[in-house]
């Protein structure tokens, strides 16, 4: 719905219109003040409208980019104002250069430092990598980022995106997230979900094929093919 999608253009248009309507009562309109407040307002309104217990806000891009700095500032304000129950989950990539064959944690360490310089200490770290992160690197990340080791979650490549929830749960993400919000950890029954994942995996391994054309503008970028640009459409076709 409209409440689930926010762009910079929408925010600026709303603020400019309010200023033109004298809703700020002559107060100077400042980007660093009023835009983050409007972001927070939209998140709160989405929760009210949808009667949500939790609101998940994805901030795209990379820490340090000018395009998302106002959203990060809004997150900082929410995290430290009025004791709001907010969790910041940072996703970082640990590359394994083929020439070295070793998983490197330095890029994630630097991205967390960049985030901390913006006023946010992450509560959780999703360690995205080709394979499962080992205990040694998890401890290194905990030491260098001030994120508890139990809050560092491994996110290796999986055959299907639907395998991700089970992978996170096995690494303790569910229990730690509930603990962060002072909520009791309930006994989980993931059998139905795991059965769905098994069915999807069987379909993907099937030798039967159906040709479906997806016409899109952004499949190519120079010499590279962008496999995830229309991922929502493609995943819907896979299990539709």
Model regions and ranges:
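Flexible phosphate-sensing "switch/lid" loops adjacent to ATP/NTP-binding sites
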Residues: 1-240
């Amino acid at each position: 719905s409209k409440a689930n999608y926010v762009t910079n253009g929408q925010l600026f248009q709303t603020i400019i219109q309010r200023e033109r309507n004298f809703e700020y009562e002559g107060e100077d309109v400042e980007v660093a003040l009023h835009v983050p407040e409007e972001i927070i307002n939209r998140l709160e309104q989405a929760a009210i409208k949808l009667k949500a217990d939790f609101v998940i806000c994805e901030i795209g891009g990379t820490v340090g980019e000018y395009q998302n700095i106002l959203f990060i500032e809004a997150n900082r304000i929410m995290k430290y104002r009025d004791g709001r129950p907010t969790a910041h989950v940072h996703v970082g990539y640990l590359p394994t250069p083929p020439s070295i064959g070793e998983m490197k944690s330095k890029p994630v360490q630097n991205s967390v430092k960049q985030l901390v310089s913006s006023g946010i200490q992450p509560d959780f770290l999703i360690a995205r990598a080709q394979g499962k992160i080992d205990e040694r690197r998890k401890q290194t990340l905990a030491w260098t980022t001030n994120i508890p080791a139990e809050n560092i979650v491994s996110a290796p490549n999986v055959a299907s995106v639907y395998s991700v929830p089970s992978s996170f749960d096995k690494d303790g993400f569910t229990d730690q997230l509930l603990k962060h919000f002072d909520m009791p950890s309930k006994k989980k029954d993931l059998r139905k979900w795991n059965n769905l994942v098994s069915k999807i995996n069987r379909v993907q391994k099937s030798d039967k094929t159906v040709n479906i054309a997806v016409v899109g503008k952004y499949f190519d970028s120079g010499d590279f093919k962008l496999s995830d640009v229309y991922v929502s459409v493609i995943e819907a076709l896979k299990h539709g």
